[in-house]
Amino acid sequence: MGRIKKKGEEGTATEYMSRSRAVRKLQLSLADFRRLCILKGIYPREPPNKKKVTGSTANRTYYFVKDINWLLHEPLLQRFRELKTYARRLKKAEAKDQPGVVKAIRRREPKVKVNHLVKERYPSFVDAIRDLDDCLCMLFLFASFPQTGVIRARMVEKCRRLCNEFMLYVVRARALRKVFLSIKGIYYQAEIMGQTVTWIAPYQFATDVPTDVDFRVMGTFLQFYLTLLGFVNFKLYATLGMHYPPQFEAAQSEASETMSKHHRKQAKKTESRVAQALADVKAAMDEDLNDEEEELDAQTKQEAAPADRDQASFDTFEAMADPAVDSDMNVPSGQDLEEAAAEADAATRIFQNLYFFLSREVPRYSLEFVIRSFGGNVSWDALDEAEAGPYGVDDPRITHHIVDRPAVSQTFDGRHYVQPQWVYDCINAKALLPTSTYTLGAVLPPHLSPFVEEGADDYMPPERRAQLAAAKNIHSTDMTIDESEAPEEIDDEDIYRKELEAELRGDDTAEAPEEPKGNTAKRKKTKAEKGKAAEEERKEMAKLMMSKRDRTLYNRIVHSKKQKQVEAQKLTARRQQIDKEKSAKKSKK
């Protein structure tokens, strides 16, 4: 007879640990424990059966025992204890009213660095890119906050600097893909290292900082995200051969928002020294360019390399391709890949050789970013402390004037006056849309989300169809083929039967009998019905061969598909009713 096992020595009870027990084991306060878990990426877990853990079903927070044991070896534990000692000494000196001692203690404040945690949580650079969405959302949010008692000015300035550096990379790499204006903010989506990165940037309005938000927790996330984005920006700049941190004086023409008023004054005073430094940096970059390209992975080369190296890589791929393999497998050839790359490159240069001028009322911080990301040139008037753009409003090269007002006092010939939505719709359509529907004072078409992909059974608004047709320069009526213009189909069975009858009569069967045109539609309908019946019979036979589990799953899929179709029909009918009501109101007027 084996030894009787005691309760709590094996199974679920040994895999989970309550939060209070974990705090006692680590000898930390609850605030420090929460901060450590956020920095290390450890989150609470829900046991499958709470009663087996502690014998109670009360609401408690549990963690994996292995995660808590992992925290025992974290160097930040000692740093937190030093901070606790520092706070106690500082409080004691302030109570004794010793300003000299307080100043000396503040100079020796322990610094918490999370550099090692970034490498620990993201072993590869692609892992960091995948987890960049929340990081960018947090930093763009804090970059719009004003200075308060909780939010320090130095923290806000650092967020703005890192966000501007990231936007400058997106502009240089032509990585922006989609933009959407919502009531929450502006959604951006970029493709970096083959990974899709989506973030939201708030509108630059007066921000009212809420009081019911725990900024201590958000500050802990912000501390980690600041370090993460700093490392990511450094690596991204290295892939393009750019100097980091960027020389904002030289990049003013591409990202003027990244340079503050103080930097602009310093740039005017030290123009010669900056030019010499930039020349030295460029020379060093040219010398190390070949070595850096060899160290980069193939994915980085495909994104950052010039077009001539892309052409060489495609030619190499074509030479290495095996015709036998290509014939047996549906493998894209080098020419197909080259065409796809050329199409993608053209989509990122839709504003190439176009000159834009922004009026004062439009959101320059967003329009400048998206226009430059797609190869356009942009300028603006001087406003408050901001300096004017590279060219004036009367420049003859200007092709598009972005205005968000009913009318303008002065107009220039040879340029289009459009509203800001035209820029964003062109980006999402990947083509230059007609400007007739975006003129001054015009009722704008709906700004549809580019993140919604309609399926075969989903409802597609007429505006979406018109937008897709305009992007492809194809009229909506050309997408459907009239049945009367379709090529006539001849049933093989009818031809064989008539040939056999002609042979029995002794007629010449060299030529097939000409089909009467009146029976074409009927014959096509009969053939379609036969094909549909055969398809239904095949499906029923396949369902009989399914197991009960697969048949249930299949029925659920079919039911869901029918529900989508019914919902799409309801939306279509509702839209038709709304259009009829609108047309009736217009006719009455």
From Swiss-Prot:
Single GO term (MF) = ribonucleoprotein complex binding
Kindly indicate whether the keyword Nucleus belongs to this entry: yes
Gene Ontology CC annotation, any one: PeBoW complex
* GO terms under biological process: maturation of 5.8S rRNA from tricistronic rRNA transcript (SSU-rRNA, 5.8S rRNA, LSU-rRNA); maturation of LSU-rRNA from tricistronic rRNA transcript (SSU-rRNA, 5.8S rRNA, LSU-rRNA)
Against InterPro entries, the record matches this protein to: BRCT_dom, BRCT_dom_sf, PES
- Domain BRCT positions: 346-440
Region described as Disordered: spans on this chain = 287-309, 503-589
Name the SMART domains for this protein: BRCT
**UniProt keyword terms in alphabetical order:** Coiled coil, Nucleus, Ribosome biogenesis, rRNA processing
Q: Where is the composition biased (Acidic residues)?
A: 287-297
* Bias kind Basic and acidic residues: ranges: 528-553, 576-589
Instruction: Give the matching CDD domains.
Output: BRCT_pescadillo_like
Output the HAMAP family linked to this UniProt entry: Pescadillo
Which PANTHER family does the entry link to? PESCADILLO - RELATED, PESCADILLO HOMOLOG
> What family name appears in the similarity comment?
Belongs to the pescadillo family.
What this chain does, per the record?
Answer: Required for maturation of ribosomal RNAs and formation of the large ribosomal subunit.
Protein's name according to its UniProt entry: Pescadillo homolog
Its taxonomic path starts at: Eukaryota, Choanoflagellata, Craspedida, Salpingoecidae, Monosiga
